[in-house]
Amino acid sequence: MMTLTLAELAKITGGELHGDETVCVSRVAPMDKAGEGDVTFLSNPKYAVHLAECKATVVMLKAEQRKHCSGHVLVVDDPYVAFAKVAQALDTTPKPADGIAPSAVIASDAILGQNVSIGANAVIETGVTLGDNVVIGAGCFIGKNAAIGQNTKLWANVTIYHQVQIGADCLIQAGTVIGSDGFGYANDRGEWIKIPQLGSVRIGNRVEIGACTTIDRGALDDTIIEDNVVLDNQLQIAHNVHIGYGTVMPGGTVVAGSTTIGKYCAIGGASVINGHITIADGVNITGMGMVMRSIEEKGVYSSGIPLQTNKEWRKTAARVHRIEEMNKRLKAIEKIVEQKKED
């Protein structure tokens, strides 16, 4: 079990400790369930009333909340960020693989860095390069001439197609497919002719990709995911999409081909983004957004109808279907009013 002293917690978070720096903690826990040996945090002031009864060894909070807590306190600028840093330090998640399994199939010319781990039944094809400390989970497939940077981890059954380039310090969850063919077809009098997808996928450093996400290879140029991007589970990123630095996408979102998404964007879950458009830096799209045209200015954008009771929704839907009729009636009324003004 990993343990940290409160002095070490203060160093990790950059916080100011009020208490015994030699006391140890071994687990992060929610405030209502924390006990001896646990560290917890207060990020929402409305829960400050519970501090008096909190049994955690130490609480991370803002300076203005310190008066509510009589035990060990770590004063930090942002308790939620401090929680993330401490959770990383106390992380007990096992590695996807440890060492090279006897059943792994590794091409003789594959280049493996120092301390590489490859799980059972993984396949590493010819020309592959794996950097130092790369971890390949059980059942993964790494295609010809692909390259994976140092410290990157792939969980079980990830598929990396030929020539895909993945940077350093990335994390890819189970079942994700990177570099499969984009949806490219030409129509010849009703017959669909497949267009070979001759580009690849380039993924930057410190990128995280959730489970069962698909990122298609480019048709001619590459599909590009820049540094520090976070992609959730079950996303579809089509061919030649370019996602900018630090952008985040929750689950279920679909991005059609050749669309460029800027830096530091936040795309809400289950959104649909049209192809061949551009989204500016700093755009925030709320959940289930349907983006059909380019967005040229940063800001918050929404579409769709928020949840209503079924009765209210049916009335709203009926009114929407009558909008054209109502518009014609309104124009007719306006015309009559204008005529009366002239008279």
UniProtKB/Swiss-Prot annotation:
Lineage, top-rank taxon, reads Bacteria
Q: Where is the active site?
A: H239 (proton acceptor)
UniProt entry tagged with the keyword Zinc-finger:
no
Quaternary structure?
Homotrimer.
Q: What InterPro entries does the record tag this protein with?
A: Hexapep, Hexapep_transf_CS, LpxD, Trimer_LpxA-like_sf, UDP_GlcNAc_AcTrfase_non-rep
Q: Which CDD domains match?
A: LbH_LpxD
Q: What function does this protein fulfil?
A: Catalyzes the N-acylation of UDP-3-O-acylglucosamine using 3-hydroxyacyl-ACP as the acyl donor. Is involved in the biosynthesis of lipid A, a phosphorylated glycolipid that anchors the lipopolysaccharide to the outer membrane of the cell.
Q: What is this protein called?
A: UDP-3-O-acylglucosamine N-acyltransferase
Gene Ontology biological process: lipid A biosynthetic process
Q: Which PANTHER family match?
A: UDP-3-O-ACYLGLUCOSAMINE N-ACYLTRANSFERASE (PTHR43378), UDP-3-O-ACYLGLUCOSAMINE N-ACYLTRANSFERASE 1, MITOCHONDRIAL-RELATED (PTHR43378:SF2)
What Enzyme Commission number(s) appear in the record?
2.3.1.191
- According to its record, what are the GO cellular component terms? membrane
Membership in a protein family: Belongs to the transferase hexapeptide repeat family. LpxD subfamily.
Q: Which Gene3D superfamilies match?
A: 1.20.5.170, Hexapeptide repeat proteins, MurE/MurF, N-terminal domain
Instruction: Tell me the organism.
Output: Vibrio vulnificus (strain CMCP6)
NCBIfam families listed in its UniProt record: lipid_A_lpxD, PRK00892.1
What keywords would UniProt list here? Acyltransferase, Lipid A biosynthesis, Lipid biosynthesis, Lipid metabolism, Repeat, Transferase
* UniProt-recorded Gene Ontology molecular function terms: N-acyltransferase activity
Q: Which reaction does it catalyse?
A: a UDP-3-O-[(3R)-3-hydroxyacyl]-alpha-D-glucosamine + a (3R)-hydroxyacyl-[ACP] = a UDP-2-N,3-O-bis[(3R)-3-hydroxyacyl]-alpha-D-glucosamine + holo-[ACP] + H(+)
Pathway it belongs to?
Bacterial outer membrane biogenesis; LPS lipid A biosynthesis
